[in-house]
Amino acid sequence: MKVALGIEYDGSNYFGWQRQAEVVSVQQTLEEALSKVTNTTIEVFCAGRTDSGVHGTGQVVHFDTEVERPLASWCFGTNAHLANDIAVKWAVKVAEDFHARFSATARRYRYIIFNSKLRTAILPKGVAHYHYPLDAQKMHQAGQYLLGEQDFSSFRAAKCQSHTPWRNIHHLNVVRQGNYVIVDIQANAFVHHMVRNIVGSLLEVGQGRQPIEWIKWLLEQKNRQLAAPTTKAEGLYLVNVEYPSRFGIPKTALGPLFLAD
């Protein structure tokens, strides 16, 4: 039997998603909880491997098991063995050809910026604090140069293991809600650090250091060294993963928190 789970987590206390020796990861913690529920060893496969400090409201995983449990037990039972910063949101049985990563058709991220001279005391680990004023409208306009299928070498980490820098961005929206600036981006997939590298360069436009057209120029150069530094991990959330409807993966609120879909 193959089961898919929707996972939400605060990545602040974890060294990323992927299981690693000698450090605590989200994958390891979830697998240990599921193994307690089944009394067997469980290995999970995820839709997107988030980095250290990155959060998830819409992560999807799957695992294979011969243990039968009511769907509610996969949620409540697993959550009983998890700390408060990881939670199972839903569980469904899926077809044998489903794969959390390879069946996905799109991933969606949101980057949350607290834009104020002074820091916030409310949920400070869930946002990236930038004290200089940002023009969200200019950031949005600049982001439109990145839409479509393009070579994202300028926004790709040096140690990225992907065979190709080509990705297809479906939408990139930047909006302001009070002191918060939200960058919402969806693509078929992302190269390593792509979202945080894009946001870093959009921040240069937002604070007036670079013109809107600079993003177009960066894309054309295909040179990571010309773009801005990678932004902080704590503002980034994996909020949704899209799959073909035949798999029956539930649709839930994207979040985080108050943000509308």
UniProtKB/Swiss-Prot annotation:
<keyword id="KW-0413">Isomerase</keyword>
<dbReference type="GO" id="GO:0160147">
    <property type="term" value="F:tRNA pseudouridine(38-40) synthase activity"/>
</dbReference>
<comment type="similarity">
    <text>Belongs to the tRNA pseudouridine synthase TruA family.</text>
</comment>
<dbReference type="InterPro" id="IPR020097">
    <property type="entry name" value="PsdUridine_synth_TruA_a/b_dom"/>
</dbReference>
<comment type="subunit">
    <text>Homodimer.</text>
</comment>
<keyword id="KW-0819">tRNA processing</keyword>
<dbReference type="Pfam" id="PF01416">
    <property type="entry name" value="PseudoU_synth_1"/>
</dbReference>
<dbReference type="GO" id="GO:0003723">
    <property type="term" value="F:RNA binding"/>
</dbReference>
<dbReference type="InterPro" id="IPR020094">
    <property type="entry name" value="TruA/RsuA/RluB/E/F_N"/>
</dbReference>
<dbReference type="InterPro" id="IPR020095">
    <property type="entry name" value="PsdUridine_synth_TruA_C"/>
</dbReference>
<dbReference type="GO" id="GO:0031119">
    <property type="term" value="P:tRNA pseudouridine synthesis"/>
</dbReference>
<comment type="function">
    <text>Formation of pseudouridine at positions 38, 39 and 40 in the anticodon stem and loop of transfer RNAs.</text>
</comment>
<feature type="active site" description="Nucleophile">
    <location>
        <position position="51"/>
    </location>
</feature>
<dbReference type="InterPro" id="IPR020103">
    <property type="entry name" value="PsdUridine_synth_cat_dom_sf"/>
</dbReference>
<protein>
    <recommendedName>
        <fullName>tRNA pseudouridine synthase A</fullName>
        <ecNumber>5.4.99.12</ecNumber>
    </recommendedName>
</protein>
<dbReference type="InterPro" id="IPR001406">
    <property type="entry name" value="PsdUridine_synth_TruA"/>
</dbReference>
<feature type="binding site">
    <location>
        <position position="109"/>
    </location>
    <ligand>
        <name>substrate</name>
    </ligand>
</feature>
